[in-house]
Amino acid sequence: MAATSLTAPPSFSGLRASRAVVAMAGTGKGGAFTGEISVEQLKDIGRWVILGHSERIVVAYEPVWAIGTGKVATPDQAQEVHGLCR
């Protein structure tokens, strides 16, 4: 499971500790990092952590057949791939 910092505590109630996986953005030791979760806080929650800022990632898509050809995907084609990514 890769829960956000807002959903992690309620999500853990139904999981055994050995299966829990936590995904949150971690910061360095100490300091004031508004909106971030510290390493010390992460260690208290679970055994596994996905580090980084995946909530801030933007995914762009262009079909292989369209690259450098001047052809573009239709809105329906783009929506189909968007659905698969989600």
Curated annotation (Swiss-Prot):
GO molecular function, one term: triose-phosphate isomerase activity
Known pathway: Carbohydrate biosynthesis; gluconeogenesis; Carbohydrate degradation; glycolysis; D-glyceraldehyde 3-phosphate from glycerone phosphate: step 1/1
Annotated keywords: Allergen, Gluconeogenesis, Glycolysis, Isomerase
InterPro entries the UniProt entry points to: Aldolase_TIM, TIM_sf, Triosephosphate_isomerase, Triosephosphate_isomerase_AS
Record-annotated active site: E62 (proton acceptor)
SUPFAM superfamilies membership: Triosephosphate isomerase (TIM)
Keyword Isomerase part of the UniProt annotation: yes
Reactions catalysed, as given in the entry: D-glyceraldehyde 3-phosphate = dihydroxyacetone phosphate
One annotated GO biological process: glyceraldehyde-3-phosphate biosynthetic process
GO CC, one annotated term: cytosol
Isomerase listed as a keyword: yes
Pfam families: TIM
Disulfide feature: none
Enzyme Commission code: 5.3.1.1
Similarity comment text for this entry: Belongs to the triosephosphate isomerase family.
Subunit text: Homodimer.
PANTHER family: TRIOSEPHOSPHATE ISOMERASE (PTHR21139:SF2)
Protein name per the record: Triosephosphate isomerase
Natural source organism: Platanus orientalis (Oriental plane-tree)
Phylogenetic classification of the source organism: Eukaryota, Viridiplantae, Streptophyta, Embryophyta, Tracheophyta
